[in-house]
């Protein structure tokens, strides 16, 4: 066992002495040491109950013949950090989480791991850390929240609360109605109930085979979720007790090129958050898998969008997907669609021979999964769209790419030309939009919010929700080198690369410039004569924000742009 380096031999008597102080007995030194990477945090609705989950897992590990050691990571609640300087820390927290997983697991030479994430950056951070450690690892998330509901039957989620702010500002709803939405949008524990970033990433863990079936959709705080925890605990001990299985199920043997590909396929079929692109690119880099934005468009062109979930469809949430057959049913349906991409089976775009943590191939896992409700998960022949729910755009404004969640865009916005209204920060944009600077026919430009320029690549849910709440969602577009919450909907294009801080063309846009967006062509263009652009470039001086935080200053110096997953460079 890997842990023998800290528990075997006369030279390790001091190490065992310390371990005995924690309650270990003689017999425990012959058992596998299992790390439990928890993310229990009181302030996050998807995490405040995870201490109970860890207890269940620890009990089951002990009963199965292992020794559990729990440790914790940090986490940022993007909803609470939204719209103020707290959001600067959200994306950087992903790197801290990855580093902490690597540090704890390798410093103590633990044999295997269970990760308990749930929200936002915590899932990708743990995935990146697990790839570095490369021991058998199972992901079992906290689970999604139930959707909220008003007395009149209106279905709610967190996005409802954000958009209600814009509606209230415009006088479209009363203060009483705003309060009712506030009090009912998030009815209890769990990751926010739509196909936002947390649930998108938890779903992709199923697609990659690193989690058990149901990980992305079984509700938080349910008996079914508790059983999932127990199954994960029993399975990880079974693997850790067997030397052959320990080698077979090393994390990189599961999360490999096939797994990354399968994740993007499911992402397209379910219209996941645009953040998944950023995170999966970072995960691919950790896995040493060659994957780029062009690869994503190639997949999107061959995957039908068969599950539309909030924010794209406000009445459908993760509990509905679970009831309708879950992620396995989505994958089974996707697998039926003929496609030919790469070297995998010619009759499926999914790599059905990909290994999963249960020991089955992906094909074996999903073979018997069926769509129970085709109004929630559609069949291929009745898909919402013949192509995937996310699209990479290119053009003079995005030479290295930009991301659009096509699944949440109205038809009227898929071919759009408008005049620019420019803001050099999210804070400026929020004031400008709320103050009436943005009108129908405008393209809101929010720049210097990329990974370097922000720093930290803030999410833009507050400005996008204001636009929607003010009734401008089908007449105003928004482009940014920042990113969006998974709850964002509308003609919102993010991750523009190169970003303003590195001299991207977005930095040279002026108020009134015409900008053209074409989903059919996959383009994002500034319609300004090249000579004028060059003249502006000679006069351009980058806006350098004062960064007081030592951590954010280091992050700004080391981070790559969004097209490269916003990962930290290891060489300067």
Swiss-Prot record:
Domain of life: Bacteria
Active site per UniProt: 485 (proton acceptor)
Annotated residues for binding of Mg(2+): 78, 120-121, 459
Catalysis: reaction(s): (2R)-2,3-dihydroxy-3-methylbutanoate = 3-methyl-2-oxobutanoate + H2O; (2R,3R)-2,3-dihydroxy-3-methylpentanoate = (S)-3-methyl-2-oxopentanoate + H2O
A family per Pfam: ILVD_EDD_N
Gene3D superfamilies, A to Z: IlvD/EDD C-terminal domain-like
Residues the entry annotates as binding [2Fe-2S] cluster: 119, 192
Record-level Gene Ontology MF annotations: 2 iron, 2 sulfur cluster binding; dihydroxy-acid dehydratase activity; magnesium ion binding
BP terms from Gene Ontology: isoleucine biosynthetic process; L-valine biosynthetic process
Residue numbers carrying N6-carboxylysine: 121
Pathway: Amino-acid biosynthesis; L-isoleucine biosynthesis; L-isoleucine from 2-oxobutanoate: step 3/4; Amino-acid biosynthesis; L-valine biosynthesis; L-valine from pyruvate: step 3/4
Cofactor(s) in the UniProt record: [2Fe-2S] cluster; Mg(2+)
Keywords: 2Fe-2S, Amino-acid biosynthesis, Branched-chain amino acid biosynthesis, Iron, Iron-sulfur, Lyase, Magnesium, Metal-binding
First-tier enzyme category under EC: lyase
Cofactor descriptive note: Binds 1 [2Fe-2S] cluster per subunit. This cluster acts as a Lewis acid cofactor.
GO CC annotations on file: cytosol
EC number annotated for this UniProt entry: 4.2.1.9
Subunit relationships: Homodimer.
Main function: Functions in the biosynthesis of branched-chain amino acids. Catalyzes the dehydration of (2R,3R)-2,3-dihydroxy-3-methylpentanoate (2,3-dihydroxy-3-methylvalerate) into 2-oxo-3-methylpentanoate (2-oxo-3-methylvalerate) and of (2R)-2,3-dihydroxy-3-methylbutanoate (2,3-dihydroxyisovalerate) into 2-oxo-3-methylbutanoate (2-oxoisovalerate), the penultimate precursor to L-isoleucine and L-valine, respectively.
Family: Belongs to the IlvD/Edd family.
Name of the featured protein: Dihydroxy-acid dehydratase
Phylogenetic placement of the source organism: Bacteria, Pseudomonadati, Campylobacterota, Epsilonproteobacteria, Campylobacterales
Gene from which this protein is expressed: ilvD
């Amino acid at each position: 066992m890997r842990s023998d380096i800290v528990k075997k031999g006369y030279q390790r008597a001091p190490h065992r002495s310390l371990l005995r102080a924690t309650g270990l007995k003689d017999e425990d030194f012959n058992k596998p040491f299992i790390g439990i990477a928890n993310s229990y945090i009181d302030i996050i609705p998807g995490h405040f109950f995870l201490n109970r989950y860890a207890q269940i897992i620890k009990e089951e590990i002990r009963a199965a013949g292992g020794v559990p050691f729990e440790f914790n990571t940090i986490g940022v609640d993007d909803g609470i950090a939204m719209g103020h300087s707290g959001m600067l820390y959200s994306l950087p927290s992903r790197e801290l989480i990855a580093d902490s997983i690597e540090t704890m697991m390798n410093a103590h030479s633990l044999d295997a791991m269970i990760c308990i994430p749930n929200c936002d950056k915590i899932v990708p951070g743990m995935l990146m850390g697990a790839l570095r450690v490369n021991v058998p690892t199972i992901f079992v998330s906290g689970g999604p929240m139930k959707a909220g509901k008003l007395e009149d039957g209106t279905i709610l989620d967190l996005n409802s609360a954000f958009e209600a702010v814009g509606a209230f500002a415009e006088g479209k709803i009363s203060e009483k109605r705003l309060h009712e939405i506030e009090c009912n949008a998030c009815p209890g524990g769990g990751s926010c109930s739509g196909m936002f970033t947390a649930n998108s990433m938890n779903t992709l863990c199923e697609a990659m085979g690193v989690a058990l079936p149901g990980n992305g959709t079984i509700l938080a705080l349910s008996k079914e979720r508790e059983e999932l925890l127990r199954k994960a605990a029993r399975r990880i001990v079974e693997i850790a007790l067997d030397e052959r299985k320990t080698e077979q199920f090393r994390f990189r043997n599961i999360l490999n090129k096939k797994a990354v590909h399968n994740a993007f396929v499911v992402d397209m079929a379910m219209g996941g958050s645009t953040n998944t692109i950023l995170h999966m690119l970072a995960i691919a880099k950790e896995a040493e898998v060659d994957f780029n934005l062009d690869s994503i468009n190639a997949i999107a062109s061959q995957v039908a969008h068969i599950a539309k979930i909030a924010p794209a469809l406000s009445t459908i949430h993760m509990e509905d997907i679970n009831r309708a057959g879950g992620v396995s049913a989505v994958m089974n349906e996707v697998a039926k669609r003929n496609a030919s991409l790469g070297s995998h089976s010619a009759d499926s775009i999914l790599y059905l021979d990909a290994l999963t943590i249960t020991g089955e191939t992906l094909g074996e896992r999903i073979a018997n999964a069926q769509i129970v409700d085709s109004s929630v998960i559609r069949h291929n022949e009745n898909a919402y769209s013949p192509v995937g729910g996310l699209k990479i755009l290119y053009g003079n404004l995005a030479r290295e790419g930009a991301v659009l969640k096509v699944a949440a865009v109205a038809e009227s916005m898929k071919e759009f030309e408008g005049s620019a209204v420019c803001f050099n920060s999210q804070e400026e944009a929020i004031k400008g939009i709320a103050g009436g600077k943005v009108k129908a026919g405008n393209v809101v430009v929010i720049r210097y919010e990329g990974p370097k320029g922000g720093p930290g690549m803030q999410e833009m849910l507050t400005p996008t929700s204001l636009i929607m709440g003010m009734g401008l969602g089908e007449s105003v577009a928004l482009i940014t080198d920042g990113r969006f919450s998974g709850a964002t909907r509308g003609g919102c294009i993010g991750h523009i690369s190169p970003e303003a801080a590195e001299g991207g063309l977005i930095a040279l846009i002026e108020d009134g410039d015409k900008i053209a967006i074409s989903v059919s062509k996959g383009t994002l263009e500034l319609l300004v004569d090249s000579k004028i652009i060059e003249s502006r470039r000679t006069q351009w001086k980058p806006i350098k924000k004062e960064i007081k935080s030592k951590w954010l200053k280091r992050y700004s110096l080391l981070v790559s742009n969004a097209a490269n997953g916003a990962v930290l460079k290891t060489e300067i």
